[in-house]
């Protein structure tokens, strides 16, 4: 048994030596990115951000290795959700879901506001187009298809196997709450505030808040109060009720803390992290036994991964952080 352990350690050391030499030559290009006056320097691997689609309402950046930042980029409209943004959300997160270099995603907003909710100008235009149809059944079908499109946009966040960290500052209203409810982790700054505003417009929220928000915070009574009244709730209340897990002083601290968390997650095995997310989502909507069966099925193959051996050797030798290949 001792010989086997020594053999594994030798293999591990040789592998790390090879990887160090490989990445020394592979990662020679330094990339500089500036966000809110903070300059991040990191070495690119073989990631090619140019391969991602170009978006009109979102900006994609890579502030650190394996970490992609998706930023809502309609600051002049308070990042309100127009038709283009709804479509681009789905395309973007489906694309990042299969991008091997992406291990963690940070979701943020440009300007003074995270998201002001749905763009009312788009709603008015949709209403005008709808008025051209006279038959109620055909109108209903058009509305149903539009709602489903909106739902799929944020479901893409939840179904993306990469953890999504929402970094919220300023206002987060209506569709913004739908959006971040689909994220894995939520951090916010002191100036953040939230509002499930749909009932104020004479409608029920239909893009995920009613389905996800109630499973995030612990009080069913409070969920109903916030939904039925459309009242604002502060960052402090969001923290108290468990809707966000950290409260930061300002936007700069918010982004720094989000990046630090993302980096910690990104250095873990992507097999383990993505498998954990899949199991958490599945288990949320299934019985305990069904959840156990699901993770057993997943791990019967994933425990045979090189990541398990790499992590085990690192823990046993208490050496450098293990290096995991992309998934």
Please name every model-derived segment:
Residues 1-60, 326-327:
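Eukaryotic N-terminal low-complexity, Ser/Thr- and Lys/Arg-rich leader segments
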Residues 185, 225, 229-231, 237, ...:
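Well-ordered beta-strand positions
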Residues 77, 101, 109-153, 202:
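Glycine- (often His-adjacent) and acidic-residue-rich active-site loop
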Residues 187-192, 244-293, 304, 323-326:
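C-terminal long alpha-helix characteristic of the crotonase
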Residues 35-110:
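Conserved CoA-thioester-binding segment of acyl-CoA-metabolizing enzymes
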Residues 152-159, 167, 173-227, 241, ...:
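CoA-thioester-processing core
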């Amino acid at each position: 048994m001792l010989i086997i352990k020594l053999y594994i350690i030798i293999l591990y050391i040789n592998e790390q030596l090879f990887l160090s030499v490989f990445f020394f030559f592979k990662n020679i290009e330094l990339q500089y990115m500036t966000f809110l006056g903070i300059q991040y320097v990191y070495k690119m691997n073989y990631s090619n951000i140019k391969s991602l689609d170009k978006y009109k309402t979102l900006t994609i950046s890579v502030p650190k290795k394996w970490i992609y930042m998706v930023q809502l980029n309609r600051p002049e409209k308070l990042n309100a959700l127009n038709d283009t943004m709804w479509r681009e959300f789905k395309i973007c997160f489906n694309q990042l879901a299969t991008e091997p270099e992406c291990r963690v995603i940070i979701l943020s907003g440009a300007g003074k506001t995270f998201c002001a909710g749905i763009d009312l100008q788009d709603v008015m235009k949709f209403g005008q187009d709808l008025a051209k149809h006279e038959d109620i059944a055909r109108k209903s079908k058009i509305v149903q298809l539009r709602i489903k499109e909106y739902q799929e946009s944020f479901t893409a966040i939840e179904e993306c196997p990469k953890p999504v960290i929402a970094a919220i500052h300023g206002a987060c209203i209506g569709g913004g709450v739908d959006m971040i409810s689909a994220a894995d982790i939520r951090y916010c700054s002191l100036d953040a505030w939230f509002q499930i505003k749909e009932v104020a417009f004479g409608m029920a929220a239909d893009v995920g808040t009613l389905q996800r928000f109630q499973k995030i915070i612990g009080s069913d009574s409070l969920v109903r109060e916030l939904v039925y009244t459309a009242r604002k709730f502060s960052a402090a209340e969001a923290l108290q009720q468990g809707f966000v897990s950290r409260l930061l002083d300002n936007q700069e601290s918010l982004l720094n803390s989000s990046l630090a968390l993302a980096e910690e997650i990104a250095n873990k095995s992507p097999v383990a992290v993505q498998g954990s997310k899949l199991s958490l989502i599945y288990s949320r909507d299934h019985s305990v036994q069904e959840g156990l069966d699901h993770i057993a099925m997943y791990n019967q193959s994933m425990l045979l991964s090189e990541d398990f051996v790499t992590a085990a050797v690192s823990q046993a030798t208490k050496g450098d952080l293990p290096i995991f290949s992309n998934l």
